[in-house]
From Swiss-Prot:
Residues of the active site: K237 (n6-amp-lysine intermediate)
Organism: Koribacter versatilis (strain Ellin345)
Gene: lig
Family of this protein: Belongs to the ATP-dependent DNA ligase family.
Cofactor or coenzyme needed: Mg(2+)
Name of the protein described by the UniProt record: Probable DNA ligase
């Protein structure tokens, strides 16, 4: 464990990607294969393989108490350490220095065993006892990184893609082979073992091991979107939960964008998905659905996180699964095939009698109108259209919004499915009102009827490895949501300043705003004008929030639009 902590320090000390990869590769070569496999997990910010359902379920408040107990530090000293470092792992190093053991006796195998024990028990008290046992044996630098591993906030400027590069470098393998194997097995540790034994080619796709989702890049206008592709498929952008459905003859599992198993939250989808009678992996969206129309996302949120969904809840918030892509079929992974071919294969899975959302007019243009759905017909093929001009895209965009959907997805018909990556092969055209996915970093007590309730949220975008505050919002959520969030934030407070609390950066929210402005008030250098919360993004993790670069893009685009309007105005004035 000591050498891994030292390696993490070395990685954090350089900003050069090539140096980070070289440091990791050298470290991996110095370890046994089992040790190296465990290390790749931890270096990727995980305690268990991506495909595993196990999690530690340890909040910052538990770690705060444990570190305080071991160090003997007062609440004031703990708070000062956290304020100074802005990171619980670094604060741990500060308060345990001179208190923790000087000699290292902790092995990676023992760390892995303790993580398994922590995941297996329930309740803060039981988890705290195990964490005390683990950290009590660690040196201060080791404790720093153990805390970071537990929180999943490593923050050393290392991505899993760079760990893949290090594996390729350490064992002399082709990077493309390493990446493909990791995508297939869903376990960076197992990928290392295959690379070490020159068996990457034996990696096989396994059902019920979720893959990363292909993500879209925002487009600012129909003109921009249309200019990207000569030939594209156009679909509605749904306001639901992105979900990957794995189906065999006797089993169905549904995974969220964060690769969590959410099958139990949607039991009525299981028989409908089983009826497909093919071994497949589908990509799609779960929608709250009634009377042939998608309901607001706030309705769908009522279903999230429930292990036992009552019949009454199923009636109140009925759901359907709208599928728009095929990743695996007939024992083969099809992600490398062009979208047009995958779409044709997906069409073939849906027999003539199966429910469909596409009504084709005499000109062969999909109308994008929704069909009525019976309770037994909960799996639907997403409608697709083609657009021959930006004006046609605008028409389809307006029609999608009339149906209560967010906007449009525009997809290159020749594109492969880029697992876990965002690119310009898929574009998303959303509402004209600008939006960002941000993470809550601090909360404040409200006023008036919300006095005493943590209802004002400060939020951040990601700038490299840092979270940079960019705004504050207090409107948009229901009273019920605010009450639930108040409870969560109190349980996950890192630093309590009285009126304001710094909280674990875990809650992702989608905020809308009118403009991005330059500002010295926030660390990002920007502020959002008239921000309001659209929804809580339970389906997204903190690593998926928007970046500072994205905020800068919106700012520049506003500037260019203003410049064009001014130019048009000047031209009109001169002509008159």
């Amino acid at each position: 464990m000591q050498l891994l902590a030292q390696t993490c320090e070395a990685i954090a000390a350089t900003s050069k990607k090539t140096e980070k990869i070289a440091i990791v590769a050298t470290y991996l070569q110095s370890r046994t294969v089992p040790e190296a496999a465990l290390s790749t997990l931890f270096l990727s910010g995980r305690t268990f393989a991506a495909h595993e359902e196990r999690t530690l379920q340890v909040g910052g408040s538990i770690l705060w108490r444990v570190v305080g107990e071991l160090s003997g530090a007062s609440e004031a000293k703990m708070t000062a350490a956290y304020k100074r470092h802005g990171d619980l792992g670094d604060a741990t190093l500060g308060v345990l220095r001179g208190v923790a053991p000087e000699e290292s006796t902790l092995t990676l195998k023992e760390v892995d065993y303790m993580f398994q024990q922590i995941a297996a028990v329930s309740g803060p008290a039981a988890k705290s006892r195990l964490i005390v046992t683990l950290l009590a044996r660690a040196t201060a630098p080791e404790a720093k990184y153990l805390v970071k591993f537990i929180t999943g906030e490593l923050r050393i400027g290392l991505k899993e893609s760079q760990v893949e590069e290090a594996i390729a470098k350490a064992y002399g393998r082709e990077l493309a082979e390493v990446r493909r194997a990791n995508m297939l097995v869903g376990d960076i540790g197992e990928t290392l073992v295959l690379a070490a034994h020159d068996k990457l080619a034996t990696a096989r796709m396994r059902l019920f091991h979720p893959m990363g989702f292909m993500l879209a890049t925002p487009a600012e206008s129909a003109n921009e979107a249309f200019a990207e592709f000569e030939h594209a498929i156009v679909e509605d952008k749904y306001d639901g939960i992105r979900a990957q459905a794995h189906i065999s003859r006797d089993k169905v599992r549904i995974f969220s964008r964060t690769l969590d198993d959410i099958t139990d939250s949607f039991p009525e989808l299981i028989p409908a998905l089983k009826a497909i009678e093919h071994e497949v992996i589908l990509d799609g969206e779960i929608l709250a659905w009634r009377c042939g129309q998608a309901l607001a996302f706030s309705e769908l949120q009522k279903r999230l996180g429930r292990k036992n969904v009552s019949a009454a809840m199923q009636r109140e918030v009925p759901v359907s699964y709208v599928t728009f892509d095929l990743l695996y079929a007939k024992g083969q992974l099809v992600i490398d095939r062009p979208l047009q071919e995958r779409a044709a294969m997906l069409d073939g899975i849906f027999s003539e009698g199966a429910p469909r959302l596409v009504n084709v007019d005499p000109h062969g243009q999909a109308s994008l109108m929704f069909a009525e759905v019976t309770p037994e017909q909960r799996v639907l093929r997403a409608p697709q259209a083609r657009a021959d001009s930006p004006e046609e895209l605008d028409r389809l965009f307006a029609a999608a919004q009339e149906r209560g959907n967010e906007g449009l997805m525009i997809k290159d018909i020749h594109s492969a499915y880029a697992v876990g990556r965002r690119g310009k092969s898929w574009l998303k055209l959303k509402r004209e009102l600008a939006m960002l996915d941000v993470v809550v970093t601090a909360v404040e007590l409200g006023h008036g009827k919300r006095a005493g309730i943590l209802s004002d949220y400060t939020f951040a975008v990601r700038g490299g490895e840092e979270l940079l505050n960019i705004g504050k919002a207090y409107s948009g959520l229901t009273d019920k949501e605010i009450a639930e969030m108040d409870e969560w934030f109190r349980a996950h407070t890192l630093v309590d300043h009285g009126f304001v609390r710094e909280v674990e950066p875990k809650i992702v929210i989608e905020v809308a705003f009118n403009a991005v402005m330059k500002s010295d008030r926030h660390a990002s250098g920007f502020a959002l004008r008239f921000p309001r919360i659209l929804r809580i993004r339970d389906d997204k993790g903190g690593e998926e929030i928007d970046t500072l670069e994205r905020a800068e893009e919106i700012y520049r685009s506003q500037f260019h639009q203003r410049t064009r309007r001014i130019h048009r105005g000047d031209t009109k004035a001169q002509s008159s």
